């Protein structure tokens, strides 16, 4: 699954550490999500969307390759 977490996080003026703390996850988890190495759980995806003020489908996209 592809995502725009990194771009949206930067637009919001947040560091990876800030986002991780607010979501209750490690910085490594944020890095993995941003680099498409880890697909978050539905709960975490919803928390990310809420934090960024967006819908989940505005952040995460199916990779149709």
What are these regions (language model features)?
Residues 22, 51-52:
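Residue cluster at the C-terminal edge of the helix-turn-helix DNA-binding motif
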Residues 17, 28, 57:
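Key DNA-contact positions within bacterial/archaeal DNA-binding proteins
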Residues 4-22:
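Short basic helix-loop element that most often maps to the first helix and adjoining turn
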């Amino acid at each position: 699954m592809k995502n725009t977490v990194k771009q949206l996080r930067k637009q919001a003026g947040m560091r990876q550490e800030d986002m991780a703390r607010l979501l209750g996850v490690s910085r490594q988890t944020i890095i993995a999500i941003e680099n498409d190495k880890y697909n978050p759980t539905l709960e975490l995806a919803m928390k990310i969307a809420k934090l960024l003020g967006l819908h989940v489908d505005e952040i995460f996209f199916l990779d149709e390759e």
